[in-house]
Amino acid sequence: MSSVFSGDETAPFFGFLGAAAALVFSCMGAAYGTAKSGVGVASMGVMRPELVMKSIVPVVMAGVLGIYGLIIAVIISTGINPKAKPYFLFDGYAHLSSGLACGLAGLAAGMAIGIVGDAGVRANAQQPKLFVGMILILIFAEALALYGLIVGIILSSRAGQSRAD
């Protein structure tokens, strides 16, 4: 009985592990950022309910991090089709590194957004001039996840370049 698989038998494991890592770690960052900044919004909203909608920005920014992981996971999973073309260890490792780059950057950004969002919305309730500063810090934290997304796209595009087609 022969296998129709061409390439390395273990390579798809690493590719799918990369897709899972991208989604899981990014969603962990998104969940942490949403929860941490959501607690800040809820506690601030008790005293200043008129600021709740203005202070929801960190929660939204944290939620976007999960989408970055989803994008990379879809890119990776569509690139794994061993029956259509050979899938070697280089491809699996490229997809694994792509998923880890995006996922761990999303996790770090989510932690930063959560902490800044929590402290920022509470401080904004006491001193409204701090809103612009909070938004700028949140943008820089979100940029960390964007860097991971960009590197993840570049690394996943490297899969398939280990051989001359």
Curated annotation (Swiss-Prot):
Q: Keywords, A to Z? A: Hydrogen ion transport, Ion transport, Membrane, Transmembrane, Transmembrane helix, Transport, Vacuole
Bilayer topology reads: Multi-pass membrane protein
Query: Where are the membrane-spanning stretches?
Result: 11-33, 56-76, 96-117, 130-155
Q: Which Pfam families match?
A: ATP-synt_C (PF00137)
Tell me which domain of life the UniProt entry assigns to the organism this sequence originates from.
Eukaryota
What's a single GO MF annotation on this record?
Answer: proton-transporting ATPase activity, rotational mechanism
Please list the residue ranges that the record places on the Lumenal side of the membrane: 1-10, 77-95, 156-165
Compartments in which it is found: Vacuole membrane
**Site annotation Essential for proton translocation: residues:** 142
Family listed: Belongs to the V-ATPase proteolipid subunit family.
Protein role: Proton-conducting pore forming subunit of the membrane integral V0 complex of vacuolar ATPase. V-ATPase is responsible for acidifying a variety of intracellular compartments in eukaryotic cells.
**Quaternary assembly:** V-ATPase is a heteromultimeric enzyme composed of a peripheral catalytic V1 complex (main components: subunits A, B, C, D, E, and F) attached to an integral membrane V0 proton pore complex (main component: the proteolipid protein; which is present as a hexamer that forms the proton-conducting pore).
This chain's protein is named V-type proton ATPase 16 kDa proteolipid subunit
